[in-house]
A protein has these predicted regions:
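His/Asp/Glu-rich mid-to-C-terminal helical/loop segments that flank catalytic regions of hydrolases
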Residues: 17-22, 93-129
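Extended hydrophobic-aromatic, low-complexity segments
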Residues: 12-16, 68-70, 100-102
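Midchain, well-structured core segments that form catalytic/ion-binding scaffolds
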Residues: 1-15, 41
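Alpha-helix N-cap and loop-to-helix initiation/capping positions
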Residues: 12-15, 48-51, 107-111
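Active-site-adjacent substrate-binding region
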Residues: 34-38, 42-94
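Acidic-enriched catalytic cores of C-N bond-cleaving enzymes acting on peptides and small amides
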Residues: 12-34
Length: 129
C-alpha cells in the first residue's frame, strides 16, 4: 500500500508520517497484523515564484471570477525541481470528478481552453513586467 502526503509545510508532513507510524503500531498490537513502513523519496516542499503565482491568480480572476483557488502543490512536479534554480509556478485545471493521477483522469475541453486563456494572459503579464 502506498501513502503519499502533500503539504507546503515540512512539519505537517513529518506529523502525518508520525501519525501513520503510530496507527500501524497500534493496529499491530490490537490485531496481530504487522506491517512495515518504508519511507521512499521525500523532498522538502518548495515555494513557487510569488510574482508568477500572482500573475496566474490575476488572470484566473479575470477569466473565472470566484471559480479559482490559489493552492500550493505538495507534489514533486517538475516545476518544484525547476523552481530551485529558476522562477516557476503551476496552473492546475480541474479533472472531471476530481480523479487525478489515474488512467481514467480527464478534463473537460472547456476547462482546458479556459486554462490556456489564463496561462496566455499570465504569461503576457509576466513578460510585460
Amino acid at each position: 500500500m502506498l501513502f503519499q502526503f502533500r503539504d507546503s509545510e515540512m512539519p505537517v508532513l513529518e506529523r502525518l508520517d508520525t501519525v501513520l507510524r503510530e496507527l500501524v503500531e497500534e493496529t499491530a498490537i490490537r490485531t496481530g497484523c504487522r506491517a512495515e513502513i518504508e519511507r521512499t523519496a521525500t523532498g522538502k516542499p518548495w515555494q513557487m515564484d510569488s510574482a508568477f503565482q500572482a500573475a496566474i491568480e490575476n488572470a484566473a480572476a479575470r477569466h473565472a471570477p470566484d471559480a479559482y483557488v490559489r493552492m500550493p502543490s505538495g507534489a514533486s512536479h517538475d516545476a518544484q525541481v525547476v523552481a530551485r534554480k529558476l522562477r516557476a509556478a503551476m496552473l492546475f485545471v480541474p479533472s472531471i470528478g476530481g480523479i487525478s493521477h489515474h488512467w481514467t483522469e480527464n478534463t473537460d475541453d472547456a476547462d482546458l481552453v479556459l486554462g490556456c486563456q489564463v496561462l496566455a494572459d499570465a504569461a503576457e503579464m509576466i513578460l510585460r513586467g
